[in-house]
Amino acid sequence: MAFDEIYRKVPSEQVARLKEFRLNHPYKQLIVGDTKWEYLSCGQGEQTLLLLPGALSVGESTFPLITAFENDYRIIAPSYALSLTMAGLCRGLANILETEALNQAHVLGGSYGGLVAQYFVRQYPARVRSLILSHTFVLTPKYAKPLWLAGKVFPAFPQSLVAPILKLRLNKMLLSTLSNANHPETEFWSAYLDEAIASDLLKEVFIHQNKCLLDLAHQRQLTSDDLKGWPGKVLIIESDDDPAIRVRDRELLRSTYPKAQVHTFCDAGHASSILKREEVFLIIRSFLHNVVQDV
């Protein structure tokens, strides 16, 4: 389906912003071993933000954060290379930072990106200045069985069935919250997700994510002791009605980072970065400012 057709219901100024972003933020490429990585590198400033995307796995999906922070921070926003373990993903991220001559970064991960961020700080603690975890959780062995089942069933689905399944999942996680709030960007994000779903690549992305998560579910669970020697600070952003992160999972995340600064939104679902965008950005800016000032 053509771009103009997908975005036909979206206000013209919102479409124009996306087109302008894509024009001004081309991807860079890096080969790590046998794997090709793509990432956005932009912005300015002495501090660096490493933005780790969620379910879509593409750096561009973090563009609201990029445009909000690129005037004050160096920004690295990678697209995850597929067919890698979580260890391979983290190794690739470290290589990107090294290639860009960046010793440290404030790492921000939302949803699936929050999982990547948690493993990255454990594998490369010296690379992480601070950690921002948004709408995410700690993987536990209880997820192994449903992940195994999904890994058996989902790859066999034809694209004609994959598209509505992904749309239903993303609608539950994001679009229904925006629609219920009558948010002015509801049509934009619906179209943006439709554009992603229209690509056959998204099926491969979800298969890859499932394999990574299943592998991790069989490994030792992350604990608060893992980062005892790490001097960085942690910010947790969550919502009291997140349909993707259950209450006990939010509690486990907080107990895994007992010294973290926590901000809990009300009635923001899995979409606080859209519904409460300005407040979220202010919270992040304040946190980053305090991290730098405390040195």
Language-model regions: role of each:
Residues 31-83:
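Conserved HGGG/HGGXW glycine-rich cap/lid loop of the alpha/beta-hydrolase fold
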Residues 230, 236-238:
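Short beta-strand/loop motif that positions the catalytic acidic residue
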Residues 142-144, 163-226:
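Conserved alpha/beta-hydrolase catalytic His-Asp/Glu region
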Residues 1-47, 71-73, 289-295:
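Alpha/beta-hydrolase fold catalytic core
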Residues 122, 130-161:
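Flexible "cap/lid" loop of the alpha/beta hydrolase fold
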Residues 243-249:
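Conserved alpha/beta-hydrolase "acid-adjacent" motif
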Residues 76-108, 112, 282:
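Active-site loop/oxyanion-hole signature of alpha/beta-hydrolase fold enzymes
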Residues 244, 265-281:
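Catalytic histidine-centered segment of alpha/beta-hydrolase-like enzymes
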